[in-house]
Amino acid sequence: MLQKLSMTALVGLFSSVVSLVNADCTYSGGNYYCAQTDAIIYSNVGLSATYQDVTNMDESSCACTQADFTASGSLAPFNEELSVHFRGPIELLQFGVYYPNGESNALKKRSEKQSIESCKEGEAVVSRHKHQHKRDVAVEYVQVTSTVYVDSNGQTVTADSTNTVVGPAVPSSYTKDSTVLSSSAQAVETSESQSSISSSKTTSSAAAASSSSSSSSNTNGDWSRGSYFVPGSTSNCTFMNNQGGTAGSGVWSSCFGNSISFAASDGVSGAASAQALGDVTIKSGNEFMIFSGEECSGNNGDCGYYREGIPAYHGFGGADKIFVFEFSMPSDTSGSAYNQDMPAIWLLNAKIPRTLQYGDASCSCWKTGCGEMDLFEILTAGSDKLISHIHDGQDGGTQDYFERPTDGTLKAAVIFNSSDKTIHIIEVDESFDATLSDDVVDQWLSKSGSSAALP
């Protein structure tokens, strides 16, 4: 049913469209794109609220139960443990996580006068056009009907028949998004068939700040590297995918499909034990994820509830942390995958993949706001524009974009700064050594860029 819009809402929507036009933004593939950037700064990140935490997944009834989880803190819910997710086509050359040694001065030195550039210098551009999300994947359910034996490298030694059922894409709850590019924004949410105007979303989400699942090493330096990966070698990183029940780790059921599992070195197959990702390029539509190297203590223990039978590991926790990446996203136009030539890197509340990343929304805390942060995402096939967006109770992002590294690589740092409630996504040139000096981090924090001010 069509709803009558107030004059205020109409004026606000008209102003948003005019701002986008004035900023020389372009409309392509259902999304607006404004200016290329080398830094995005999220501000006012964090809220105190409640989301629905999964407390049980019943294999007999195929039903999940949830309970209120109420918490707060600077950057919530992103001060909770996070898992790091990748979708092809992508080649990951480096990944790391840093934590401060004691109290980091760099997180306190940010000037309130930092210059923020938007689509047009000196002007705030407010956009309410829908961020077209492309996270859903066609899920292949693989039911294991006999034992599969693997060696220490995850290679199959003997294998009997399996029954593979390929069905339609399992719908996730990624159906509505709002995009914010200024502190004065009010949300306009759109669905596939209609648009409606509203004030900032009130979907509850929050999380308690959790300590790092991997302690900082006791070395000289202001930030210590707690996790690190280069192809074929990894420290305190566990690579996983959604091939549970196919190769000796994780589970499959007719209720919930494949769980997470250890990933083989190709990133695509399952494995019986943890392996480092090899020197590979992951093709379109395939996904893998990284957890820390620390196992959960047990179900309903230090990781909360998780699906029975999975390899359960901690994510990367703490309100102050730095993720670093070096990656390439080459073109991949030869296939017909659901997300063909649409690479992405994003963060999830680690509770989500430990229960159900894709499928019944009641089996995940995602819909109720426990947190997703898209760091670098292509929204339309073949695009060279990587956007960023936050999905939680605040929902926001920017129409500015990073250039996709189809040739060569992109090095980036993502800094979580609890002292002023900001998250910085920044292109960098520095090497990712065992320690980062406070001066380097301060330089990163001082870098101006595109504003993504949350309501």
UniProtKB/Swiss-Prot annotation:
It catalyses: Hydrolysis of (1->3)-beta-D-glucosidic linkages in (1->3)-beta-D-glucans. One of its GO terms (biological process) is cell wall organization. GO terms for cellular component: cell periphery; extracellular region; fungal-type cell wall; fungal-type vacuole. Disruption phenotype: Leads to a slight sensitivity to the cell wall damaging agent calcofluor white. Also shows a slightly decreased ability to grow at 39 degrees Celsius. Results in an increased resistance to Quantazyme, a recombinant beta-1,3-glucanase that hydrolyzes beta-1,3-glucan. Glycans are attached at residues 236, 417. Residues 190-219 have a biased composition (Low complexity). The keyword S-adenosyl-L-methionine does not apply. Residues 1-23 form the signal peptide. Residues 158-221 are annotated as: Disordered. Keywords: Cell wall, Cell wall biogenesis/degradation, Glycoprotein, Glycosidase, Hydrolase, Secreted, Signal. Present with 12300 molecules/cell in log phase SD medium. InterPro entries: YJL171C/Tos1_C, YJL171C/Tos1_N. It is found in: Secreted; Secreted, Cell wall. One of its GO terms (molecular function) is hydrolase activity, acting on glycosyl bonds. Its main location: secreted. Probable circularly permuted 1,3-beta-glucanase involved in cell wall modification through beta-1,3-glucan network alterations such as increased branching or remodeling. Residues 172-189 have a biased composition (Polar residues). A motif (ExDxxE motif) lies at residues 372-377. The conserved ExDxxE motif might be important for catalytic activity. Induction: Expression is regulated by the cell cycle SBF transcription complex. Its EC number is 3.2.1.39. The keyword Nucleus does not apply. This is Probable circularly permuted 1,3-beta-glucanase TOS1. Belongs to the PGA52 family.
